[in-house]
Amino acid sequence: MSALGTLSGGAAGVSGLLRLRRRAAPAPAIAAPSHLPAGTVKCAAAVPDAAPIVWGRQLRPALLLPAALLPSLQPARRHTLQPPAAAAESAGEAKSVGFLEKYPALVTGFFFFMWYFLNVIFNILNKKIYNYFPYPYFVSLIHLVVGVVYCLISWSVGLPKRAPINGTLLKLLFPVALCHGIGHITSNVSFAAVAVSFAHTIKALEPFFSAAATQFILGQQVPFSLWLSLAPVVIGVSMASLTELSFNWTGFINAMISNISFTYRSIYSKKAMTDMDSTNVYAYISIIALIVCIPPALIFEGPKLMQHGFSDAIAKVGLTKFVSDLFLVGLFYHLYNQIATNTLERVAPLTHAVGNVLKRVFVIGFSIIVFGNKISTQTGIGTSIAIAGVAMYSYIKAKIEEEKRKKSA
């Protein structure tokens, strides 16, 4: 209590702390460091080793030193090594993990959803256009025009940055683009001629043509298990074709031609493998395919369009809806193809193959619901068998490719 009374009565600044010492033998003087000027250490020897405790704190001689000199008398602080992540976190500089890196499964699911959604919307809107504007060559051309404009705008803003192209690469991409253009036109002729569900059922035969081309054109052995899985596809398409109410030879033949064209596109794509990213490759293919598709559109449909094609469509739905439908269907066509490519880059081939089969199921199912297409029982069974066969084929092929990659790794 006497100490506290002394502190309360005479503590005015640091000098008041000197009265709080016991009468004891003086401690040895603390020598000032050599780098400090004389007289900077004040009363260091006047405070004994057993300094008094005031309010739970022990007085130290350092309290009597100027604040600027305190660090020089303090012991060096040890720095412990920490892992980079822990060190950054302790300093408040930890890099925040973005949503895309934190939830990759959700992002992949979003890609699949957009792929299905855009594909279904494209097929439905495309068929609605053909119901009042039956000119598939011109509509196919519009698909590519909108896609090319989209690519040019993307290049202009650097999303993505345009990859340079030379004559050698142009020669490699031209056959791919030619097959892409032919397959695109014939697919649309088929979509315009028959029900969307039936056209996609016929297009389920594409793996059969791909296997045949691999075996007999490229000379590569196709495993027997793959051929066996294609049998349900052929049987299912045959059953569906025999009883399809919207069947006509124009739609059937053009769907088969598109299968062959896309098969050759795959073959030429393997020969034209480049280091260019998929977005730029698809952009260049779209530009070349657009040039390829202009002549047949002008030859087969140009005169009819100028005579009554445009005027009839505008009279039915109006100019605004006609133009907006063409723009949207072209945009959906380009985006769903681009998203499909981006999805393939994010997942394993097996996952993509299964997703592609499910996409066809979604398109067939939604087209039947939206357009109210009547299908016979045999057509429904045949379509189901064909889709199941494609799923089996895709699974076996992806497994074989995966085993090849593991062996080569």
From Swiss-Prot:
UniProt keyword list: Chloroplast, Membrane, Plastid, Transit peptide, Transmembrane, Transmembrane helix, Transport
Segment annotated as transit peptide: 1-85
Transmembrane segments: 105-125, 138-158, 216-236, 281-300, 379-399
Protein's UniProt keywords contain Transcription regulation: no
Entries under InterPro entries matching the protein: Sugar_P_trans_dom, Tpt_PEP_transl, TPT_transporter
Residue ranges, Chloroplast intermembrane side: 86-104, 159-215, 301-378
Coiled coil spans: none
Localization: Plastid, Chloroplast membrane
Lumenal side: 126-137, 237-280, 400-409
Membrane topology: Multi-pass membrane protein
GO molecular function, one term: organophosphate ester transmembrane transporter activity
Complex formation: Homodimer.
Role summary: Mediates the export of fixed carbons from the chloroplasts into the cytosol in the form of triose phosphates. In addition, it can also bind and transport phosphoenolpyruvate, thereby increasing the photosynthetic efficiency of C4-plants.
Name of the protein in its database record: Triose phosphate/phosphate translocator, chloroplastic
Species of the source: Zea mays (Maize)
